[in-house]
Design a protein with these regions (language model features):
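Extended alpha-helical coiled-coil "stalk/arm" regions
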Residues: 346-370
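Bacterial N-terminal signal peptides
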Residues: 16-28
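Globin-like tetrapyrrole-binding proteins
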Residues: 779
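Sequence context surrounding c-type heme c attachment/ligation sites in exported
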Residues: 201, 208-328, 332, 675
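N-terminal secretory signal peptides that target proteins for export/translocation
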Residues: 1-13
């Protein structure tokens, strides 16, 4: 443990090693250094890799003689061309009930109302489907659905993960920013710029008050705060964790925006892609003013972090200045009081007590060691010293409880310190709203240095801000321009402009691939976060480039790409033979893993791929069908709690517990059990593509969870209320709500028998002996537990 010039305690990892190990390590390092000094030709040869070439709009193929089906837009032409190479063709369009259910879940994440289905089926106008697409795109719930996808890409969570998984109050503002951005169809280049450098777009420090738009722009930089942060709750500043947090902010953002994995480049130049270790640290240098290891801001207040934090209060300028002064003072006081309680007071009284009773230790060596350690000043003791002293506490009755009883002076001092801490807490209980943002901490940051083997204790030469040479547009080098009249470096703003340059080869390709993936279940590139040499090849390379060019040429409009995909004949195909086609294609074409991914994705275009709803959509659909869903938009997250049986659920005390799942507090270690059963991630990192498992726990969760049973009962009450007195009408209403269709005759007969077995009553078509609520609850429970409810065709 060391102290720097400012007196801040820092932890180092240096240990004394045996001489032989030191010698062997030195030889290994010397050998590896010589090996790394020889430049590899591999990265240079890969500058011709497909994804590193500028996007050029390809010619739409003429496939009029290759397919009997109508082509609705260029997407269909590209897909038909690839299918023809595999001896396949597109399949017919799905029926209207299937299309509206598919479209509703795709765009807003909820099942359609039966009245919406009936209206769409009855609409004979030629543009009925296109009108439906526009209506769903205009829904405020569209932003909730598609924000959830982006939050996966960003790795959004409202806690730190480490050391108690400390909560980040107010971080929900970033989530709300993303929802609003999707609803407004904010141009993607602007969306990227605000998330990387929203704080550099205006002089927020000088602003007298913040407009709602400015609050959103600052909240957007929460994108860089999404990765886990081990520095949020440290008692001492551990440089290893500081650097890890800084590196994660850069790595996750570049993976999300450029689709390149860069973790390995911390330690050495990329073995496959044209990314040098020097370039990695040039990117780090762009983030250095905001994430400066020598001038670190904690993410939250804690006993270990008493000073200012990485957050901006939503107050006018005088209020912000007063808030900073006041919080700095009371945090420092609280920190000192905690130190007194946990360190000074407790340790001094403990040491006094143990010295007085040390003779009770029978082991002579242990007694001598204890007396020697107690004679040291506490500041001179090592962690191992304190660990040994603590091991004797119980035996000598030096616990805090025992000390309070034995020494009234200690108890009084302890009570006074605790009383003052509680008074501070009450004085500051009503903190102003906070924006958990990213911003430059200093106008003169410490120099960024290349770290040998990624070790912060082995800094090499300093590096200037820069980007990847293999991706830079020719004739337009990366340049950081100082923002006039601003206390910001302008580095992240320059990075955003480099990424959104029309000639950048990756940004548009990566995003349109993500959009395709969320519409079809698999991207045109099966590895959405790895467009490098080791990633998958695009199944439809010309289609990918055409979409990327179309994206940029139409103002980076995400909804424009939605319209193209959703209105295509490719997306509107039926799905009943898709699985068979994919199996045949895999058997014929897949000779290795890469080809298998290519075959599956290509064949998926010969029929829509049936797939299971995500965890959040399942929960939301259960609430919607039951008539329980609270559709309130935006605001604070729903708290979760750990139950005595080990499960995690939304707090039963929450008055808004029936809101959509995107509003559930995303603590990394306490994801609701129902959601984890259906593959909701814990966000230990970002999740560009979720797992899609089929496990027994999923069926058990729907059969036995109190939430599913509650929804089933409310669903049954809704059916009884809206379905009329006749069994067939009620069952029809239940099917319409759950499946967006009417039951077949054999299904009516099956559920009649099922209902009678639960209600012990025969059912007449006239409704003379209607089933009980218990029977209808069982019927509704069966519908909600079925594959047809969980899957979209």
């Amino acid at each position: 443990v060391q102290a720097d010039a400012s007196g801040q305690v820092r932890c180092c990892r240096k240990v004394i090693l045996p001489l032989a190990f030191v010698i062997l390590s030195s030889l290994a390092i010397a050998h590896s250094s010589r090996a790394e000094a020889v430049p590899s030709s591999t990265p240079h040869s890969l500058k011709g890799h497909w994804s590193f070439q500028p996007v050029r709009r390809p010619t739409v193929p003429d496939v009029s003689r290759l397919t009997p089906h109508a082509l609705r837009n260029p997407i269909d032409a590209f897909v038909a061309s690839e299918l023809a190479k595999q001896g396949l063709s597109a399949v017919p369009e799905a029926d209207r009930q299937t299309l509206i259910r598919r479209l509703s879940f795709d765009l807003i994440g909820l099942p359609p109302e039966p009245e919406e289905v009936e209206q769409f089926i009855a609409d004979l106008k030629s543009d009925a489907y296109e009108t439906l697409v526009e209506r769903f795109l205009a829904s405020p719930h569209y932003g909730e659905r598609w924000a959830r996808h982006w939050l996966d890409v960003a790795g959004f969570a409202e806690s730190s993960m480490f050391i108690g998984d400390a909560v980040r109050p107010g971080f929900w503002r970033y989530r709300d920013y993303v929802i609003r951005a999707f609803n407004a169809d904010k141009p993607y280049n602007q969306f990227v710029t605000e998330q990387l450098a929203g704080d550099e777009l205006f002089d927020w420090r000088s602003a007298h008050t913040f407009t709602p738009e400015q609050i959103d722009t600052l909240a957007a930089t929460g994108f860089l705060r999404c990765p886990p942060d081990a520095t949020d709750n440290q008692l001492i500043t551990q440089f290893e964790k500081v650097y890890a947090t800084q590196q994660a902010a850069m790595e996750v953002s570049m993976k999300a925006l450029m689709g390149l994995t860069m973790n390995c480049v911390r330690c050495h130049s990329h073995k496959y892609d044209p990314i040098s270790q020097d370039e990695y640290y040039k990117l780090i240098a762009i983030f250095q003013p905001a994430y400066d290891p020598e001038n670190w801001l904690a993410g939250i207040w804690s006993a270990g972090n008493p000073g200012p934090i990485r957050a901006i209060p939503v107050l006018d300028r005088p209020g912000r200045e007063e808030y900073e002064r006041r919080t700095r003072n009371w945090q420092a006081e609280r920190h000192n009081l905690n130190e007194q309680i946990n360190g000074g007071l407790l340790r001094s009284w403990r040491d006094r007590h143990m010295k007085a009773r040390a003779e009770e230790i029978r082991d002579d060596a242990a007694r001598a060691k204890l007396m020697s350690l107690l004679s040291k000043a506490s500041a001179e003791r090592t962690p191992d010293d304190e660990k040994f002293i603590d091991s004797q506490v119980e035996a000598l009755g030096a616990t805090q409880t025992a000390l309070e009883k034995a020494y009234p002076g200690f108890a009084g001092a302890l009570a006074a310190a605790r009383t003052r801490i509680e008074a501070i807490r009450k004085e500051n209980a009503n903190l102003p709203p906070l924006i958990w943002a990213t911003f430059d901490v200093s106008t003169n940051p410490s120099p960024a240095r290349l770290l040998h083997r990624g070790d912060y204790e082995q800094p090499a030469h300093s590096v200037e801000p820069g980007v990847l040479r293999a991706l830079g547009p020719s004739g337009d080098p990366f340049h950081v321009a100082k923002v006039p009249h601003s206390r910001t470096s302008g580095g992240r703003l320059a990075l955003a402009r480099w990424l959104t340059n029309r000639e950048h080869p990756l940004t548009a390709r990566v995003m349109v691939n993500r959009l395709w993936q969320y519409h079809f279940g698999m991207g045109l590139v099966a590895t959405p976060d790895d467009f490098g040499e080791r990633g998958a090849r695009p199944t439809h390379p010309e289609l990918l480039d055409w979409l990327a060019a179309e994206f940029m040429d139409n103002g980076w409009s995400i909804k424009h790409i939605h319209r193209l995909i959703l209105n295509s004949a490719t997306w509107r195909q039926t799905s009943f033979i898709a699985a068979t086609v994919r199996r045949e294609a895999d058997a014929n074409l897949a000779s290795d893993d890469t080809t298998a991914a290519h075959a599956s994705t290509g064949a998926a275009a010969a029929g829509f791929p049936s797939r299971r709803l995500e965890a959040e959509a399942i929960r939301d659909a259960l609430l919607e069908v039951a008539g329980l869903l609270d559709r309130q938009l935006f605001g604070e997250s729903l708290p979760t709690q750990r139950l005595p049986d080990g499960r995690t659920d939304i707090s039963t005390n929450s008055t808004t517990r029936l809101r959509r799942s995107i509003y559930i507090s995303t603590r990394r270690t306490t994801v609701p059990t129902l959601l984890t059963a259906f593959d909701a991630p814990s966000m230990d990192t970002n999740w560009p593509k979720r797992n899609d498992s089929v496990i027994p726990q999923q069926a058990l969760a729907l059969m036995n969870s109190s939430f599913a049973l509650e929804c089933s009962e409310h669903f049954a009450r809704r059916v009884l209320r809206e379905g009329g007195p006749i069994f067939e009408k009620r069952l029809g209403r239940a099917f319409a709500l759950a499946y967006a269709r009417q039951p077949e005759p054999d299904e009516v007969a099956l559920f009649k028998k099922f209902g009678e077995s639960h209600g012990n009553a025969a059912i007449s078509s006239g409704g003379d002996k209607p089933l009980t609520l218990e029977s209808w609850t069982a019927i509704c429970h069966a519908l909600l537990s079925s594959n047809e409810f969980l899957y979209v065709d």
